């Protein structure tokens, strides 16, 4: 995250483990809430375990600026709209303190009133094949997706949306 504003934090550090009681900040057009632990007892393999709460962030900004988010769901880097999300997130960290992709385990909900998807090659091809032009640049409405990340692989429960 490149810029956090109006940060309020309560944390403690003991035995190479930061316990984050609460961090609240404004970022990427919305707000972020975070609590959990950052454990560096094994200095070669730090571990994070966070509860993350996102409200009304700009989708494209998050999925462009946060490398891990982009690697997990690259499709959303070109999406339009805002989203909210709650997520339990666990990961090992590398030497630069970035999550190690294949160690990420998480679950949560992705919620948005509307997500616009522009210039997605797969959707454009499907739109041509089924002769349904609305699929070329769809705008998905009233999204509530329950997702799971297991060892860095994202899956989602079936969900309904309107185009």
Predicted region positions:
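Small-residue helix/turn framework positions
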Residues: 1-163
């Amino acid at each position: 995250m490149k810029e956090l504003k109006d940060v309020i934090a309560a944390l403690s550090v003991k035995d190479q483990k930061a316990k984050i009681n609460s961090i609240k900040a404004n970022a990427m057009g919305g707000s972020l809430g975070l609590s959990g632990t950052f454990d560096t007892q094994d200095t070669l393999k730090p571990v994070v375990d966070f509860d993350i709460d996102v409200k009304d962030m700009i989708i494209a900004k998050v999925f462009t600026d946060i490398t891990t988010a982009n690697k997990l769901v690259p499709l959303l880097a070109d999406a339009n709209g805002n989203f909210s999300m709650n997520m339990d997130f666990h990961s090992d960290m590398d030497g630069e303190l970035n999550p190690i992709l294949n160690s990420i385990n998480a679950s949560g909900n992705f919620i948005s009133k509307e997500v616009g998807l522009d210039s997605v090659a797969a959707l454009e091809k499907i739109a041509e094949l089924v002769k349904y032009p609305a699929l070329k640049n769809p705008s998905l409405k009233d999204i509530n997706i329950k997702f799971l990340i297991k060892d860095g692989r994202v899956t989602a429960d079936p969900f309904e949306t309107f185009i």
